[in-house]
Swiss-Prot record:
Its EC number is 2.8.4.4. InterPro entries: Elp3/MiaA/NifB-like_rSAM, Methylthiotransferase, Methylthiotransferase_CS, Methylthiotransferase_N, Methylthiotransferase_N_sf, NA-bd_OB-fold, Ribosomal_uS12_MeSTrfase_RimO, rSAM. Belongs to the methylthiotransferase family. RimO subfamily. This is Ribosomal protein uS12 methylthiotransferase RimO. It holds the Pfam family TRAM_2. It catalyses: L-aspartate(89)-[ribosomal protein uS12]-hydrogen + (sulfur carrier)-SH + AH2 + 2 S-adenosyl-L-methionine = 3-methylsulfanyl-L-aspartate(89)-[ribosomal protein uS12]-hydrogen + (sulfur carrier)-H + 5'-deoxyadenosine + L-methionine + A + S-adenosyl-L-homocysteine + 2 H(+).
Amino acid sequence: MSNVMQQPKIGFVSLGCPKNLVDSERILTELRTEGYDVVPRYDDADMVIVNTCGFIDSAVQESLEAIGEALNENGKVIVTGCLGAKEDQIREVHPKVLEITGPHSYEQVLQHVHHYVPKPKHNPFLSLVPEQGVKLTPRHYAYLKISEGCNHRCTFCIIPSMRGDLDSRPIGDVLAEAKRLVEAGVKELLVISQDTSAYGVDVKHRTGFWNGSPVKTSMVSLCEQLAKLGVWVRLHYVYPYPHVDDVIPLMAEGKILPYLDIPLQHASPRILKLMKRPGSVDRQLARIKQWREICPELTLRSTFIVGFPGETEDDFQMLLDFLKEARLDRVGCFKYSPVEGATANDLPDQVPEEVKEERWNRFMALQQQISAERLQEKVGREILVIIDEVDEEGAIGRSMADAPEIDGAVYLNGETKLKPGDVVRVKVENADEYDLWGSLV
């Protein structure tokens, strides 16, 4: 008969954005380190943790449904994450939830787990945790979160009320985590935060230390150091501050990926003012032109909102005109949706749903045409591709221009001997609006 004690089991569900995924990874790493077993089925677990999203109404609904499912299948549920900042809203629907915490409340979550499912007598030989921690992404890429919160007060957003003001991680800690990930086999680091280009503003860009040398806490310094690790480094959620210009030469030199994810949101100065976003469209177009002159391989991704309160046909036409001139590579578009607690809800002249839908369709049709033309320019060229999946039909990867889950893919039909994480040279043979097809060189 075995004398090995049964490890307590925790079920876990993670909803929302990559930043939430990083929070989940941190909680799971601590649980595994303490000897808890993480299981895929709620009915096998001693307790379930639901890490929620509360950014838009559909995310709130998804989170509430996930909580309900966990309660039905298990009964012992702890809720954390962004929606946890609205405890009353959760308890109104699910009064039987045991405990509720807000986002990045790691220690509170663990304390609650210890209370309801006491910490096991940990045997390190039974529950080994890799040095880089538990990761919910494939082994070859990882999200690297550099800060929490945001100092902006965009009228459509409630993130600051949930995650607080900007709180930058010490640059030495960020770089140490990046190094551990690379040593564990990660080939691509995706730098994320609510506002990546504001990194270090809250600490007045104080000097930190890495490998015994002083390093300034700033996005540019961080990129310079990450470049030394010899892996792909991709920047997300980059607010268009002037100093963003300083990272473009690093991209041109091949030190970090020539990829910028800049959420511009709109192009009408009047709508941008209502959103409390920077509003110089001409300046932004000039910068895009300058960036491309310095780094011709640059891929630009952005997101936009159509149907924002007060948006007229003239405002929307300005947005379409901007798309035609900017010719962005990757674009996401959302129909404005009221978010509980957002100040934009109180703005006059709400746009009817059918108008939002019609504008969204026009926006997407134009951008699909632009995207198809941009990708067609790559046919006949050779590009580097990182492999994500391999099955009996071939391999699927991404180019330097493609972030996981949100951008396009590169299909290599018949290439069944590659492995996820391989970086290969590919000749592009075909393209559509979003994806490429090619063969190994």
